[in-house]
A protein has these predicted regions:
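Catalytic-histidine neighborhood of serine endopeptidases
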Residues: 1-40
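Flexible glycine-/small-residue-rich
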Residues: 13, 25, 36-39, 82, ...
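C-terminal cap/linker of serine protease catalytic domains
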Residues: 6-8, 20-21, 39-47, 53-55, ...
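Short, solvent-exposed secondary-structure boundary/capping segments
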Residues: 30-37, 108-116
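Terminal peptide-recognition signature
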Residues: 21, 35, 75, 80, ...
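Flexible, gly/ser-rich surface segments that form the specificity/activation loops bordering the active-site cleft
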Residues: 25, 45-46, 57-111, 120-123, ...
């Protein structure tokens, strides 16, 4: 994690509204990092408002009462939020839907799950929601499709992975940030889920 700690990292609600963040902890094996906002002096009013709502900024995002206690189930519907490709297409948050297609990750990794929700480069670290608005996982770095294609002779389609909420919580707890489980139980529309995601997801930029 020392390499990440030497990089400048900023967060915000888009590429033009960024504030500096300190990298407190990293977990390379799970593609997780814990950030702390270091200054909001130059932030826009919208960014300050978003940071105020979050209270705690974690990359991937997790905070008090957001993570679901039960791990995802096979066939469960999910919604993924993030800022794929940064600001190349637009500065706005993007959401995609899908379902849990396997309850294990690459190489039978029990700490991850597979989903068919569309995930593009730059989506890593984005929250994955269940139908009630609870976070059930965090998008892990995208599958190296070229490498897989060379191994099996074809490009994998709709194969993406998430880190289970239980692993995210374990990382936060070991970093000295205990969290409470989320208990949302009312099913929401995708529009409602997107609204929640917009208020809980930030763009993270690592500057070389």
């Amino acid at each position: 994690g020392e390499g990440y700690k030497r990089q400048e990292v900023t967060v915000g609600d888009n590429a033009q509204k960024q504030v500096t963040a300190d990298v407190l902890e990293t977990d390379r094996s799970n593609d997780l990092a814990l950030l702390r906002i270091s200054s909001t002096k130059m932030a826009s009013a919208d960014t300050k408002s978003l940071i105020s709502k979050l209270g705690i900024t974690v990359v991937p995002l997790a905070s008090d009462g957001l993570l679901r206690s039960e791990d995802v189930e096979l066939g469960e519907s999910v919604l993924v939020a993030g800022y794929p490709y940064g600001d190349i297409f637009s500065n706005t948050i993007k959401v995609t839907g899908g379902m849990v297609s396997a309850n294990r990750g690459m190489g039978d990794d029990t700490g991850q799950f597979q989903m068919d929700a569309a995930v593009q480069a730059g989506s890593s670290g984005g929250p994955i929601y269940d139908e009630n608005g609870n976070i059930v996982g965090v998008v892990v770095a995208q599958l190296n499709k070229l490498k897989v294609a060379k191994a099996i002779g074809s490009f994998p389609e709709n194969v993406n992975f998430g880190i289970k909420a239980s692993n995210v919580r374990q990382f936060l707890t070991s970093s000295g940030l205990p969290t409470k489980w989320s208990k949302r139980s009312k099913r929401m529309s995708t529009k409602q889920l997107a609204k929640i995601a917009k208020n809980q997801t930030v763009m993270v930029v690592c500057h070389p």
